[in-house]
Amino acid sequence: MLVLGLTGSIGMGKSTTAKLFGEAGVPVYDADATVHQIYEGEAVPAIEAAFPGTTVDGKVDRALLSEKVVHDSDAMKRLEQIVHPMLRSHHQNFLDDAEASGAPVAVVDVPLLFETGGEKRVDAVVVVTTSPEVQRERILARENMTPEKLDAILARQMPDAEKRRRADFVVDTSHGLDPVRAQIREILDAAARMPRRRP
């Protein structure tokens, strides 16, 4: 089974692209959805211990947690040390299940793929991109997003140009869904002929 790592900076259209891979019959692992899941379960005690006051009704309150970590790189590192091992375990379970199902290709949707060294654990990388103007417009339309918060998020992410340079495939979401579907078909055709690279 070939594993494609899907990544892209905030607001690039990565979640939509992941859904379209799913529509094409490809198993898709969603790291963000897994974070939501562990924030409602296994990560709660460790996060409350590290960041007191960030849980409400037995769940991590993402807004409260964000206030504690978004401008503090040491706090962000502590959070990652809690969350990343849990995510790796869920990720491996997904791959085992996808392989057992006989899927020829699986997609792992990981926002910080390059930033966490995740490109070494996939066979090829798909980077989702759009113009800076469209990106900013999409992000600032989100609830609870401010220009300052956006700048702090972007400062932690590898620049889009560098991600595109390191990608095996690039999906441009600037022109609507049909062109994205066509790009996905091309990627899946190419992936069928690619050798496995991950260990």
From Swiss-Prot:
For this protein, the record's InterPro entries field holds: Depp_CoAkinase, P-loop_NTPase
Pathways per UniProt: Cofactor biosynthesis; coenzyme A biosynthesis; CoA from (R)-pantothenate: step 5/5
- Subcellular location as annotated: Cytoplasm
Major site of localization recorded for this protein: cytoplasm
Could you name the domain of life of the organism this protein comes from?
Answer: Bacteria
| GO annotation terms (biological process) | coenzyme A biosynthetic process
* GO CC annotation, single: cytoplasm
Q: According to the UniProt entry, what is the EC number of this protein?
A: 2.7.1.24
The entry marks the following residues as binding ATP, namely 11-16
Keyword line = ATP-binding, Coenzyme A biosynthesis, Cytoplasm, Kinase, Nucleotide-binding, Transferase
Q: Supply the CDD domains for this chain.
A: DPCK
**Annotated Gene Ontology MF terms?**
ATP binding; dephospho-CoA kinase activity
Reaction catalysed by this enzyme? 3'-dephospho-CoA + ATP = ADP + CoA + H(+)
Task: Write down the top EC class of this protein.
Answer: transferase
* Residue ranges of every copy of the DPCK domain listed in the record: 3-199
Q: Which family does it belong to?
A: Belongs to the CoaE family.
Sum up the protein's function in the record's words: Catalyzes the phosphorylation of the 3'-hydroxyl group of dephosphocoenzyme A to form coenzyme A.
Name of the protein in question: Dephospho-CoA kinase
Origin organism is: Rhodopseudomonas palustris (strain HaA2)
Organism classification: Bacteria, Pseudomonadati, Pseudomonadota, Alphaproteobacteria, Hyphomicrobiales
